[in-house]
Amino acid sequence: MTLRHPILAELDPARPILIAGPTASGKSALALEIAEAQGGTVVNADALQVWSCWRLLTARPTAEDEARAPHALYGHVAPDRAYSVGAWLAEVAALMDKGCDSGRGRLIVTGGTGLYLNALSRGLAVIPPTPPEIRAQADQLVRQPGGLARMIEDLDSSTRARIDLRNPARVQRAWEVLTTTGRGIAAWQAETPPPLIDPAAAHLLVLNPDRDWLAERIARRFHLMLEQGALDEVRAMLPHWNPDALWAKAIGAPELVAHLQGRIDLDEAARRAVIATRQYAKAQRSFFRGRMRDWRWIGIGG
């Protein structure tokens, strides 16, 4: 990976670092380079790399990379466990406490899940979980004709003004919170506690790769995953496949499952997976532009 800026020389070794960027942009490589040069623990901030069932398919650091510097929160969650941004934040807090106790508290947090990085640097509202029966009711309502519009009508005015009403998942989440707690999600978010990492005391970086460079890298990386055995990873999970499970959201998993089930050939599965990955990268860029404009953007490729 070639950076346009001599970033290593500009980083204070005493400050934590947060590195965002679209998939396949080289975040993990940069984090490892920083850890080797300045010390620190590389901490995963990718919601798909937490699952123990995926290493190749989610491009987790290799065992060799993990041996070069301390890594944390990679592949540590079993597929049958529930996991959330709140659980991830609690684990990061534990790492920070452990680091303070040992005198090795510098974290290099890297990943493409903007929600994780945003919660770490801005705080996360503590909202009671949604009971299964409320979730089932919401799932049923949102599938009905006009169900989403009814959900929007039920929301309080502050929440309607705050959330993206074009996003069904956001609307359903807000409806579930209101139905469960009797309070709008905007009211809960107004009570957001201070962030675990003070943005003013950290280096906040966003890798911003050239689009053509990234598209070529995405395609090359997925084919390399297949060569290294990603299809076998998916085959091992096929008996447990549930497309609604969080671990099943790994990019490329649905496409490879379709191949293993005999619905498409491997070339078509790879083609679709590469397209899905590019679409995911586009969505990541959109999130970063909206939420991380004040971070330092680093151009790559091109």
Swiss-Prot record:
MF terms from GO for this chain are:
ATP binding; tRNA dimethylallyltransferase activity
Q: Which residues bind substrate?
A: T23, A24, S25, G26, K27, S28
Needed co-factor(s)? Mg(2+)
Q: Which Pfam family would be a valid example here?
A: IPPT
UniProt-annotated binding residues for ATP = G21, P22, T23, A24, S25, G26, K27, S28
Per its record, the protein catalyses: adenosine(37) in tRNA + dimethylallyl diphosphate = N(6)-dimethylallyladenosine(37) in tRNA + diphosphate
Root EC class = transferase
Q: Which GO terms describe its biological process?
A: tRNA modification
Q: Give the site residues for Interaction with substrate tRNA.
A: T113, R135
Which keywords does this chain's UniProt record carry? ATP-binding, Magnesium, Nucleotide-binding, Transferase, tRNA processing
Q: What is its EC number?
A: 2.5.1.75
* Top-level taxon of origin: Bacteria
| Family the UniProt entry places it in | Belongs to the IPP transferase family.
Q: Which HAMAP family match?
A: IPP_trans
The annotated subunit structure for this chain is: Monomer.
In terms of PANTHER family, this protein maps to: TRNA DIMETHYLALLYLTRANSFERASE
- Annotated function: Catalyzes the transfer of a dimethylallyl group onto the adenine at position 37 in tRNAs that read codons beginning with uridine, leading to the formation of N6-(dimethylallyl)adenosine (i(6)A).
Q: What is this protein called?
A: tRNA dimethylallyltransferase
The protein's organism comes out as: Paracoccus denitrificans (strain Pd 1222)
The gene it comes from is miaA
